[in-house]
Amino acid sequence: MAQFDLTRINCQYLDRHLTFPLLEFLCGKEIYNQQELLEYILETVNKTNMIDYTMDTRKRLNLSQEMPDELVQRKAEVLATLKQLQNEVAPIMKATDILKNGESMKDSKTFVNALQKDYNFKVEHLESAYKLAKYLYECGNYQESTSYLYFCLIVMSPNDKNYLNVLWGKLAAEILTLNWNTALEDLTRLRDYIDSANFSTIQALQQRTWLIHWSVLVFFNHPKGRDLIIEMFLYKPLYLNAIQTMCPHIMRYLATAVVINRTRRNALKDLIKVIQQESYTYRDPITEFLECLYVNFDFEGARLKLHECQTVILNDFFIVACLNEFVEDARLMIFETFCRIHQCITISMLADKLNMKPNEAECWIVNLIRNARLNAKIDSKLGHVVMGTQPLSPYQQLVEKIDSLSMRSEHLAGLIERKSKQKNQESIDSWKYY
C-alpha cells in the first residue's frame, strides 16, 4: 500500500544514517521497485564515509564484485583522516581514561579543571574530539562515536557553537546502537535544551519537528515509550502544535500508541478531538478506524479499517513490531464499544464485527472474562454474551482529571511566557527612539 507509506516523508526529518534502517526495511517489502530503492540507498550512502556499505550496495545492484579505484582511493583517505584525528585526541582521551573512575568525572567543572591542571587541556582538544566523533559517526562507527560525544557533553559549555550538534549526534548514535535507555535520556536532554533555548519561533518549530520524528524511534522501542509518546505528543501544547502545523502524519504513531496502551484509555477522548481537527490534512486507516468506532459508531466500517490497519502497520518500520498487539487491542476496543450499546449480544454477531470465526470469538471472550478484564457471562446454549456494568475506576477518573489540568496549566504557562517575551521586546524597541 504505497499510498499509505510514510517513509519518504519521515526520511525528510531524519539524519541520513537514521534513514538506512527504514530503507533496508522497505527492501524486504514489495511496495517499491527494488532496483530504484537500492539505487537510492547507494546515492545516500555515497554521501557518507561508509565505504564497505557502499561496496555491499553496489554488489546488490550487480554493478561490480571488485572495489573501483575511486572507492579504493577514498577508503585510503578516510583511514588516513581517521588516524590523524585519533592522534590529535589521543593524549586527552588517555587522561580521560585515568580520570573516569574518579570523583572528578561526576562533576563537569571539576573534571575540566583536572584536565586543565594535570593534562594541559586546551580548547583545541575539544574541537578535535568533536571532529573525531563526527567523523566516526560518518564512518558508521556509532559505538565509538558515542564515547567522544559523551566527552564533549561533559566538557562543552551549553553556549558552545557545537553543543546542539553534539546533542543531536549523541541521540542519533544511541538510536543506531539500540541503546534505548541512554537514547531516552539524550532525548529528554535535547528536548529540554530546545524548549529553553532562545530560538526564533520558526527555528523552534523546526527543531521540535525533527525531534518528534527522531523520538518515535525511541518511544516504540523503550518500555516506557508508550506513555511518554502520549505525554509529549498529545499533552505538551508546543509539540502538539508542531504536529498539527508541520507533520500531521505523526498522528498515525500517536493513535497507535493510544490503541496499544490499555492503561491510557482516558487519552482517547483528547486523541479523537485532534484526529477530527486534522482529518482535512491527514487521514489513514488507523485514524479512520478510531473515527469509525468512536465518532460514527460504524462497526462495519471499523471492521474493514482494522483489516487495512494490519497492512499499513506491517509495512511501517516504526510500528511493525506492534502489529499483533494492535490487532488484539483494536478488537477489544470494538468489543467494548459494541457492548456499551448492546447488553445482550450473539457470539456470531461479535465474530463478524471482530473478523473472527464464532468458535475463535467465543474463546477470545472466555479469556477476557477469565483474566478479569471483562464483566460478562456467556450463555453457551443460546450463543449469547450478557454484559454486566463496567463503571470507570476512580484511578482512571483521577488520571483523566490530572491530564486535563496538566494540559491547561502548560497552555497557560506558554501564553504567559509569550506575553512576557512580547512585553520585553516592546520595552527594548522603545529604546531605539532615545
Curated annotation (Swiss-Prot):
Residues 219-392 form the PCI domain. It is found in: Cytoplasm. It comes from the Eukaryota. GO terms for cellular component: eukaryotic 43S preinitiation complex; eukaryotic 48S preinitiation complex; eukaryotic translation initiation factor 3 complex, eIF3e; intracellular membrane-bounded organelle. The keyword Repressor does not apply. Keywords: Cytoplasm, Initiation factor, Protein biosynthesis. InterPro entries: eIF3e (IPR016650), eIF3e_N (IPR019010), PCI_dom (IPR000717), WH_DNA-bd_sf (IPR036390). GO terms for molecular function: translation initiation factor activity. SMART domains: eIF3_N, PINT. SUPFAM superfamilies: Winged helix' DNA-binding domain. One of its GO terms (biological process) is formation of cytoplasmic translation initiation complex. Component of the eukaryotic translation initiation factor 3 (eIF-3) complex, which is involved in protein synthesis of a specialized repertoire of mRNAs and, together with other initiation factors, stimulates binding of mRNA and methionyl-tRNAi to the 40S ribosome. The eIF-3 complex specifically targets and initiates translation of a subset of mRNAs involved in cell proliferation. Component of the eukaryotic translation initiation factor 3 (eIF-3) complex. The eIF-3 complex interacts with pix. Interacts with mxt. Belongs to the eIF-3 subunit E family. This is Eukaryotic translation initiation factor 3 subunit E. It comes from Drosophila virilis. The gene is eIF3-S6.
